């Protein structure tokens, strides 16, 4: 009898440019492949045995001739290359119109409404920036004036950074809730609270980041699961991405190691339902910072942690490992990249095989839906291929 399905999203671990990547400025991007070559090879014995070497050319991870899992890759059908778009498509919501971006900063009507309705003394920044860089550039002025640092990226995001000694965490969250309401008509995917700590020149972001997402514009597979009485545990930023819709339990995490440990612990007590996990460090700490060595270490950390999760799965359980977009740390850009994403599916006792290139991330959601016996409107399930 079907019991549990685990989805691990290695945030940003793309595996090669999509055909339209050049239109996004991402020709040649291959987060996994380019990272492996930048560091002289990766040591990923578990992922390699599962078939990761089949999805793109990864130095140190050759294609295993007898993989233990089913392997393939997925292409994004929606416009965009961001976290929200990728996760929504995985759960059956394909965006025909891309979410709005602000390459020139936010217009006065947005900024003025934010200042007026939050009571903030003004804002600093209002530009496209790397979050780790802008807090070093403006952090001292922020602490002196109390003005939050507002910035965006190539993605549809309104980010608000504040030092926790200057703006209490709950105040920052309240400001972001206000921004979320202001920005709904503008089709901005996420408002992100970016708390940081430290002293001038040594500022560092914390894991108390919080995302305030635009609600999905259509019913997701997650919502259908909950309507059918299927438990859905969101680990990491999953609840934020879906505006807490279709989630029955939330697990906050402090990075990849914590998220992986909590996932293993969940499998000791959860005997039915979906466990949906986002592992954010790949993207937040290494992809956006163009740090291939750190990215490689995080991949190897994931590889070492996987056995504790795989060993807790029994007959009828499934585990799918994928990503939501790319963020190639070897390219000049510090933004996300428009890439295929890997798809590894472990079905205990079933061996492995080739799932090919799926034409939409929604194939994963269709598979989840079929596994639990609910309806899906988008995508083609591969459940029969991994359970035959």
UniProtKB/Swiss-Prot annotation:
Its EC number is 5.4.2.7. Transmembrane segments: none annotated. Pfam families: Metalloenzyme. It catalyses: 2-deoxy-alpha-D-ribose 1-phosphate = 2-deoxy-D-ribose 5-phosphate; alpha-D-ribose 1-phosphate = D-ribose 5-phosphate. It is found in: Cytoplasm. GO terms for cellular component: cytosol. Pathway: Carbohydrate degradation; 2-deoxy-D-ribose 1-phosphate degradation; D-glyceraldehyde 3-phosphate and acetaldehyde from 2-deoxy-alpha-D-ribose 1-phosphate: step 1/2. Binds 2 manganese ions. SUPFAM superfamilies: Alkaline phosphatase-like, DeoB insert domain-like. Mn(2+) 2 binds at residues 283, 288, 336. One of its GO terms (biological process) is 2-deoxyribose 1-phosphate catabolic process. Mn(2+) 1 binds at residues 11, 324-325. The keyword Protein biosynthesis does not apply. The keyword Phosphoprotein does not apply. Keywords: Cytoplasm, Isomerase, Manganese, Metal-binding. It comes from the Bacteria. Its cofactor is Mn(2+). Isomerase that catalyzes the conversion of deoxy-ribose 1-phosphate (dRib-1-P) and ribose 1-phosphate (Rib-1-P) to deoxy-ribose 5-phosphate (dRib-5-P) and ribose 5-phosphate (Rib-5-P), respectively. HAMAP family: Phosphopentomut. NCBIfam families: deoB (TIGR01696), PRK05362.1 (NF003766). This is Phosphopentomutase. The lineage of its organism: Bacteria, Pseudomonadati, Myxococcota, Myxococcia, Myxococcales.
């Amino acid at each position: 009898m079907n019991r549990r399905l685990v989805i691990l999203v290695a945030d940003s671990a793309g595996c090669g440019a999509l055909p339209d990547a050049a239109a996004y400025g991402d020709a040649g991007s291959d987060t996994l492949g380019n990272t492996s070559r930048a560091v002289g090879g990766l040591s990923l014995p578990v992922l390699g045995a599962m078939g990761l070497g089949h999805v793109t050319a990864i130095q140190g991870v050759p294609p295993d001739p007898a993989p233990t899992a089913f392997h393939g890759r997925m292409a994004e059908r929606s416009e965009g290359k961001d976290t929200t778009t990728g996760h929504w498509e995985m759960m059956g919501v394909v965006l025909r119109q891309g979410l709005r971006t602000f390459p020139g900063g936010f217009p006065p009507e947005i900024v003025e409404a934010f200042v007026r309705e939050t009571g903030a003394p003004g804002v600093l920044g209002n530009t496209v920036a790397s979050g780790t860089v802008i807090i070093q550039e403006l952090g001292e002025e922020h602490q002196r004036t109390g003005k939050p640092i507002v910035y965006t990226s190539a993605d549809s995001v309104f980010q608000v950074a504040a030092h926790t000694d200057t703006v209490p965490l709950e105040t920052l969250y309240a400001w972001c809730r206000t921004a979320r309401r202001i920005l709904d008509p503008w089709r901005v995917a996420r408002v992100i609270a970016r708390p940081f700590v430290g002293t001038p020149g040594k500022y560092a972001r914390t894991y108390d980041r919080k995302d305030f997402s635009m609600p999905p514009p259509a019913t997701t597979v997650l919502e259908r699961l909950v309507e059918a009485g299927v438990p859905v545990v969101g680990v990491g930023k999953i609840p934020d991405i879906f505006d807490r819709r279709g989630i029955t339990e939330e697990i906050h995490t402090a990075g990849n190691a914590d998220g992986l440990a909590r996932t293993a612990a969940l499998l000791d007590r959860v005997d039915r339902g979906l466990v949906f996990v986002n592992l954010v460090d790949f993207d937040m700490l290494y992809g956006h910072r163009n740090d291939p060595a750190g990215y490689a270490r995080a991949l190897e950390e994931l590889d070492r942690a996987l056995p504790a999760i795989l060993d807790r799965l029994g007959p009828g359980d499934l585990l799918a490992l994928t990503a939501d977009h790319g963020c190639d740390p070897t390219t000049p850009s510090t933004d996300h990249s428009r890439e295929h994403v890997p798809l590894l599916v472990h079905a205990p006792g079933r061996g492995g095989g080739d799932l090919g290139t799926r034409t939409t991330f929604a194939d994963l959601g269709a598979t989840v839906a079929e596994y639990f016996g609910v309806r899906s409107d988008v995508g083609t399930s591969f459940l029969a291929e991994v359970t035959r």
